[in-house]
């Protein structure tokens, strides 16, 4: 007798049980796997950590939180936050503006130094930030590259890369292997362009 797979959010193991039992039609396999991923993703706890000097990255962090449903209590200014707080999250959205020749926002230095000492295996990390590609094309949003490179050895998984075609002529360190490593909001771009990029980034992160 055929049994129907559970729709109660039992997770990946329930789907695998029915797949291996041979009772789920082949055409349903992809949809069921996607459903499991969606259920698992939306049970993940998300934290936003940002560094902001002029308020632009703070505003961007608030906009991302509103768009993704992240609670205000889970939005942290790294000037006041502890890296220990990051350990309580499954998905970290990390944001910084870029200063000087591709440098981090000031409050990020101590926070990143502490964060890169944490074991972040199993956590997902997505990057966002603000910059000016017209004035600083070779270091546009390079603070994101600083964060990524600093966390490479922590065991985290980076998500949220965008197609480099979104940023025509990108020459900074955020452009790698045909991808841009995160959401780079350009001071010179229109609000419509920035919003469209944010939507693509949110989708790439997995929301």
What do these predicted ranges mean?
Residues 4, 17-18, 29:
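Polybasic, lysine-rich low-complexity intrinsically disordered segments
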